[in-house]
């Protein structure tokens, strides 16, 4: 999968093939639904076998499906598949975890860190403004960026404009033993 054209993580939990991907819009939607809880905390809770965890899981799937299915349908699908031994609950949780990992910047990216504030909220408006002003994306395009793609674009922009030194992909001869 290309970092600039992420496909998302394929998952089938309700009879439909879907691709889960954490775009800026998905993160913002989740933070709107749960304003006091950061995205990483929501996903951690969704992995637990508690009522609160299941509610977070339903909201996360709802946001990842962009509202194309109702929360009731998601809950019913998870309940039916789990009771029939399909292992759907764990499949969906694994897909969510993988989608988050694939959508976030590499841990070494330092220019635009994905930091949460004290409450654990990622500042999505900052990413939208930069994507529209600096990169010329429309609002719709900016909402559909992953934070990983945003980070790659920002690194390239900063390097091209001399704001950041280009990282060499090779080892100079003087560093060889």
Predicted regions, residues:
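Charged interaction scaffolds used for protein-protein
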Residues: 1-177
């Amino acid at each position: 999968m290309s970092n600039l054209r992420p496909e998302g993580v394929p998952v089938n939990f309700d009879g439909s093939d879907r691709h889960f991907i954490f775009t800026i819009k998905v993160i913002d939607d989740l933070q709107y639904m749960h304003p006091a809880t950061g995205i990483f905390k929501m996903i951690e809770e969704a992995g637990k076998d508690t009522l609160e965890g299941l509610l977070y899981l339903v909201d996360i799937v709802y946001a990842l499906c962009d509202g194309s299915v109702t929360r009731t349908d998601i809950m019913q699908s998870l309940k039916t598949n789990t009771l029939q031994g399909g292992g759907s609950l764990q499949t969906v949780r694994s897909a969510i975890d993988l989608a988050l990992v694939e959508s976030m910047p590499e841990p070494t990216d330092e220019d635009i860190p994905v930091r949460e504030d004290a409450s654990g909220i990622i500042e999505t408006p900052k990413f939208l403004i930069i994507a529209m002003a600096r990169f010329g994306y429309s609002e719709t395009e900016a909402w559909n960026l992953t934070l990983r793609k945003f980070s790659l674009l920002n690194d390239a922009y900063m390097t091209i404009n001399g704001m950041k030194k280009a990282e060499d992909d090779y080892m100079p001869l003087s560093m060889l033993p």
